């Protein structure tokens, strides 16, 4: 019969593909369960209030039109819904595809069963497939994996969350319009079961059997599979466990399959007492906690509670005397085998000869160890015992008492067993690889010895007192030929013949009285030894490795091992060299990957890589978690070193008097520093002792592991310091900003210095790591803060700054800001608020408007540079850009609302436009016209002023940041600054040349050069924030005249001061001049330049018309408003770096010259 798994056997390949797919689906479900967006859980009140109206469960399907009409009625809900869609459609689609795969899996399995019944596969029926060993395994696995999928989904992705995700996918995707979509079937299969994985939650009635029956499956198939699992050893595991007391361990995988599949036929669990008794007697006579798939544990006492037959059958196993007997037995076994293993692990004990002579004994010891570890780990696990279940608690307490359970001793047994297993495996692999070479070597040596003896008896080779003997000569030559004729490939015949040759050599020694000659005896003894070695070597079989692999399976502990993490870490803390022993345990755990990958590999599925990566990644993450104790301990020592160096040890001056030497010696503190440094070195040594290890398919390099661990610990501590150090009290007078920055600066300097100190002792690039990680923390926090202003947010798994191995921690927000960078920015904005402070441009300083006390100055930004570095200032700058964009967008919507939708304001503006046209003319009776328009539009200026001043305030801050960045760049990196400036000038020259002559080259759209150079220029402060275009705009009617009117409406609130320029007239009606000018300038910059032209022309017309009206007075005097307007034009030209002639185009130059002399 054709091999069932052969590539040309369609029947076998079809079911193999289904099973392979099943394993891949479970891996995907487990992977996705870690990425459920928190918002779908609707746990906290804020999420419920915000998203409650747009996230629906299956009640939505009762009347979708009703729900959608509610959404359509509220534009803000529509907007939120659209934003939610943009942010979550990618992850929701991924979940939907996983759910769809589960449904497709069972549809494919049902179709395969139908094909078998209909005879699609020639000469194959359900019965014949179940008779085949591989076919039987695959059919059982196919149904079992479907059950596991359903259980995993319910455990890892709550029913309500599934429903919300499916409804969201239905609403946001094209699935609803697709005719061939099986959305309905998927929803029916995965609707909420009412099950909750929370401890203490009640189990829903008829769960999980009603869930398992949502898609009908061929009943005779289920029945036959259960029959096979009840009667057969489908994986032939019993041969690896010959002892009867190990029978339940041998059949553990089959027992897990049977446990899951019985839910497809719950009548057996309920009423078939005989069958259940048979199942319990065969599979669960001495165990009741089982692992069903990759460490998912189930306690049968709890799981079978609702089923009468199952519960009754299990009572014998759970009889207190049986529980006591099992616990005591495993306690005794574990003590006995632990002593044996420790003996085996003694240096020099496991030699090749010893191993080859004692294979059965060593394998028995391994079996006992692994069986004891399995039973004790499963039956003492907290995850398998619901603390609210009294019976479970009693059984567990009984086990803990009778087995004298001590987690440390059990862990030590696991550690030693893993080490023992690892050494044995490595020895066997080595011996197998050298098997033929060694065998041939022994054969050659034995044959040569016989030839030499033949030569001795020929009389050719003189040997003391050996007489010539032609018979012996011929006999030894024959033996030599016989040895040479042994064939390695025919090991059975060779083994038999070797034994005969050994006997012949023993007999020849006795019959021919050869004992009298010691040299001849030695030759015979050597040859017999070589022949013995040949027998030993030929008996090295791969079956031993396979048995060790089966026996050493640790997949049941895939999750349970986590309960030993604290013990592992404590052991490492006490003795860092423990890491080398742990390596064997991690490798033993890696063998669990064989379970899900076997079928995927057999099917040559492309899923092999992603599934391997998932499980290997999970294991590597666990290894990192355990070994993280080393960087943690190093940092604890490091903090003590920092404290000693900063507070206790006095820095030695360059010149020192001899008599003061004792004062500076400080032997005590210096000895303490040396001791702590030595401890750090020991920890480093400990982790580096672990060789480069292949965990699954991921190579773990201990040096990289150490560096990543140090980075992780650094990130954790620095992120916490930044979070805690930048929390402000908005009511504090004066502001806490500068003291907190200084304090945080000292903390950051301490970290920086300690990192410099440690780098040589742990062989890392301290400064490089420091800069990379601090920049990552700041950039990530800026990104999170900017998410507030983005419609499509950057999720953690999309962020280029977030990492799974070295995660940046997230902290609960303490105010409206999400992160420390937001709090810092808002605190700066609060203390430099233009309504409260006055910015003096020449001094770069802010003063309180009422008390005239200094509030802050440009020193603030050098302090931020010292504390947070260039990354901090640059991040602050980026955040201000987002805030300006938001403010400008708000301004545009406000403009639409208060001006373009207000008939009265529009009529006033039309009248004014008519009165001032053409712009080059002088407006007659100007005062009356202007101030009448201002009076009619008075109500709109408050909101307008606030928006303009906010933008202006942020632009001033951006200028200050650019100055500080540019100064520090020129000071610290003059070559970088020069290179950037030259490259910038060269690029601008090339672009200008292209516009003069379009045949010259120009960077294309797909060329990232301009974007990349912009990032560098902004980081080096080589840019002008006032020239930046923040938003795209459309044409706005009345825009220039509204801005002009706004400006002249503000001028009466200001007065000119010779020393300070324009200042606020009354603190009760606050207006700050620099933010006002810069805010208007920035606003106009966002629109076409003709708007600016019109705006300047209107100011020029206002100045000329007002001056014209003044000259008719007896004593002509320049009005204050004209002075303000002239100063605005001057400042406008200065800030935009435009020549004065731009202003003179609208105002005669003699007025400009005159007004300065009059002031």
UniProtKB/Swiss-Prot annotation:
Q: Which residues carry this modification: Phosphoserine?
A: 917
Q: Specify the superkingdom.
A: Eukaryota
Entry's Gene Ontology cellular component terms: cytosol; early endosome; endoplasmic reticulum; WASH complex
Q: Which InterPro entries match?
A: WASH_strumpellin (IPR019393)
User: Oligomeric state and partners?
Assistant: Component of the WASH core complex also described as WASH regulatory complex (SHRC) composed of WASH (WASHC1, WASH2P or WASH3P), WASHC2 (WASHC2A or WASHC2C), WASHC3, WASHC4 and WASHC5. The WASH core complex associates via WASHC2 with the F-actin-capping protein dimer (formed by CAPZA1, CAPZA2 or CAPZA3 and CAPZB) in a transient or substoichiometric manner which was initially described as WASH complex. Interacts with VCP, PI4K2A.
Function, as annotated: Acts as a component of the WASH core complex that functions as a nucleation-promoting factor (NPF) at the surface of endosomes, where it recruits and activates the Arp2/3 complex to induce actin polymerization, playing a key role in the fission of tubules that serve as transport intermediates during endosome sorting. May be involved in axonal outgrowth. Involved in cellular localization of ADRB2. Involved in cellular trafficking of BLOC-1 complex cargos such as ATP7A and VAMP7.
Spell out the protein name for this chain. Answer: WASH complex subunit 5
Q: What's the source species for this entry?
A: Pongo abelii
């Amino acid at each position: 019969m054709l091999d069932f798994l052969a590539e040309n056997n369609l029947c076998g390949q079809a079911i193999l593909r289904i099973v392979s797919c099943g394993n891949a689906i479970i891996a995907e479900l487990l992977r996705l369960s870690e990425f459920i967006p928190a918002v779908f859980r609707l746990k906290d009140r804020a999420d419920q209030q915000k998203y409650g109206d747009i996230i629906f469960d299956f009640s939505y399907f009762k009347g979708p039109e009703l729900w959608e009409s509610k959404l359509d009625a509220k534009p803000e809900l529509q907007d939120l819904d659209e934003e939610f869609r943009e942010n979550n459609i990618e992850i929701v689609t991924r979940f939907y595809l996983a759910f769809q795969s589960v449904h497709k899996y069972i549809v494919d399995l049902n179709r395969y069963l139908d094909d078998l019944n209909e005879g699609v596969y020639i000469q194959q029926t359900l019965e014949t497939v179940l008779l085949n060993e591989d076919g039987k395994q695959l059919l059982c696995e196919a149904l079992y994996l479907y059950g596991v999928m359903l259980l995993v989904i319910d455990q890892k992705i709550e029913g309500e969350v599934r429903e919300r995700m499916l409804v969201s996918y239905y609403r946001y995707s094209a699935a609803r319009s697709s005719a061939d979509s099986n959305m309905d079937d998927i929803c029916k299969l995965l609707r909420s079961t009412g099950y909750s994985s929370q401890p203490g939650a009640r189990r829903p009635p008829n769960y999980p059997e009603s869930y398992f029956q949502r898609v009908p499956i061929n009943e005779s198939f289920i029945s036959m599979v259960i029959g096979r699992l009840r009667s057969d050893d489908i994986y032939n595991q019993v041969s690896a466990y010959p002892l009867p007391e190990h029978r339940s361990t041998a059949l553990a995988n089959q027992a897990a399959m049977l446990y899951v599949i019985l839910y497809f036929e719950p009548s057996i669990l309920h009423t078939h007492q005989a069958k259940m008794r048979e199942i319990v007697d065969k599979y669960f006579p001495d165990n009741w906690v089982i692992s069903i798939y990759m460490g998912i544990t189930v306690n049968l006492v709890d799981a079978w509670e609702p089923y009468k037959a199952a519960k009754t059958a299990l009572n014998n196993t759970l009889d207190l005397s049986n529980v006591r007997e099992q616990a005591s037995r495993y306690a005794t076994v574990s003590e006995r085998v632990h002593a044996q293993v420790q003996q085996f692990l003694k240096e020099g004990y496991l030699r090749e000869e010893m191993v080859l002579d004692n294979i059965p004994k060593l394998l028995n010891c391994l079996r006992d160890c692994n069986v004891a570890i399995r039973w004790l780990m499963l039956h003492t696990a907290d995850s398998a015992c619901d603390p609210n279940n009294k019976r479970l608690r009693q059984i567990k307490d009984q086990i803990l008492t009778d087995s004298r359970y001590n987690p440390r001793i059990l862990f030590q047994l696991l550690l030693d067993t893993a080490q023992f297993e690892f050494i044995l495996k490595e020895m066997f692999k080595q011996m197998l690889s050298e098997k033929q070479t060694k065998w041939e070597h022994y054969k050659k040596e034995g044959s040569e010895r016989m030839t030499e003896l033949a030569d001795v008896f020929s009389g050719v080779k003189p040997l003391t007192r050996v007489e010539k003997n032609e018979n012996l000569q011929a006999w030894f030559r024959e033996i030599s030929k016989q040895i040479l004729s042994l064939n390695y490939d025919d090991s059975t015949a060779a083994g038999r013949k070797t034994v005969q040759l050994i006997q012949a050599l023993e007999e020849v020694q006795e019959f021919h009285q050869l004992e009298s000659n010691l040299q001849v005896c030695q030759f015979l003894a050597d040859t017999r030894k070589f022949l013995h070695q040949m027998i030993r070597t030929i008996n090295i079989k791969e079956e031993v490795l396979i048995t060790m692999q089966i026996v050493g399976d640790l997949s049941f502990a895939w999750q349970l091992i986590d309960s030993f993490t604290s013990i592992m870490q404590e052991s490492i803390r006490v003795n860092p060299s423990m890491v080398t022993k742990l390596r064997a345990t991690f490798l033993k755990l890696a063998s669990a990957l064989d379970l899900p990958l076997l079928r995927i590999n057999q099917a040559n599925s492309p899923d092999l890589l992603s599934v391997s990566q998932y499980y290997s990644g999970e294991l590597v993450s666990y290894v990192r978690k355990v070994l993280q104790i080393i960087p943690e301990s190093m940092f604890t020592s490091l903090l003590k070193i920092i404290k000693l160096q900063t507070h206790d040890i006095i820095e030695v001056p360059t010149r020192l008097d001899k008599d003061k030497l004792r004062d500076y010696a400080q032997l005590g503190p210096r000895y303490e520093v040396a001791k702590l440094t030595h401890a750090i070195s020991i920890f480093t040594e400990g982790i580096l002792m672990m060789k480069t290890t292949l965990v699954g398919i991921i190579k773990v390099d201990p040096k990289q592991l150490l560096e990543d661990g140090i980075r992780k610990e650094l990130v954790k501590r620095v992120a916490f310091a930044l979070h805690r150090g930048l929390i402000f009290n908005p009511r504090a007078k004066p502001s806490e900003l500068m003291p907190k920055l200084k304090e945080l600066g000292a903390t950051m300097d301490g970290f920086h210095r300690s990192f410099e100190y440690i780098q040589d002792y742990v062989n890392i690039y301290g400064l490089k790591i420091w800069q990379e990680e601090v920049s990552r923390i700041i950039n990530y926090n800026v990104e999170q803060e900017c998410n507030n202003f983005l419609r499509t947010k950057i999720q953690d798994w999309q962020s280029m700054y977030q990492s799974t191995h070295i995660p940046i921690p997230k902290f609960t927000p303490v105010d409206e800001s999400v992160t420390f960078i937001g709090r810092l920015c808002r605190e700066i904005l609060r203390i430099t608020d233009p309504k409260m402070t006055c910015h003096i441009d020449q001094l770069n300083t802010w003063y309180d408007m009422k008390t005239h006390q200094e509030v802050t100055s440009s020193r603030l930004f050098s302090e931020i540079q010292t504390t947070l570095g260039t990354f901090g200032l640059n991040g602050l700058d980026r955040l201000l850009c987002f805030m300006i964009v938001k403010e400008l967008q708000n301004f545009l919507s406000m403009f639409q609302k208060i001006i373009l939708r207000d008939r009265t304001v529009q009529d006033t503006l039309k009248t004014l436009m008519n009165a001032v046209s053409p712009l080059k003319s002088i407006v007659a009776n100007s005062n009356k016209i202007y101030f009448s328009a201002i009076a009619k539009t008075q109500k709109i200026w408050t909101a307008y002023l606030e928006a303009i001043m906010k933008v202006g305030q942020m632009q001033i801050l951006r200028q200050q940041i650019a100055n500080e960045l540019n100064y520090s760049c020129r000071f610290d990196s003059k070559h970088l600054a020069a290179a950037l400036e030259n490259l910038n000038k060269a690029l601008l020259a090339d672009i200008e040349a292209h516009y003069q002559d379009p045949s010259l080259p120009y960077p294309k759209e797909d060329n990232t050069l301009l974007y990349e150079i912009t990032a560098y220029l902004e980081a080096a402060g080589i840019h002008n924030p006032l020239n930046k275009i923040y938003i795209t705009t459309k044409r706005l009617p009345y825009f220039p005249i509204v801005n002009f009117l706004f400006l002249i409406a503000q001028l009466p609130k200001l007065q000119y001061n010779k020393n300070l320029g324009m200042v606020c007239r009354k603190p009760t009606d606050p207006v700050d001049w620099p933010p006002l000018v810069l805010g208007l300038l920035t606003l106009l910059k966002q629109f076409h330049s003709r708007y600016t032209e019109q705006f300047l022309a209107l100011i020029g017309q206002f100045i000329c018309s007002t001056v014209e009206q003044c000259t008719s007075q007896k004593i002509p005097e320049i009005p204050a408003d004209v002075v303000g307007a002239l100063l605005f034009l001057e400042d406008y030209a200065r800030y935009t770096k435009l020549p004065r002639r731009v202003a003179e185009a609208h105002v005669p130059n003699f007025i400009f010259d005159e007004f300065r002399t009059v002031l």
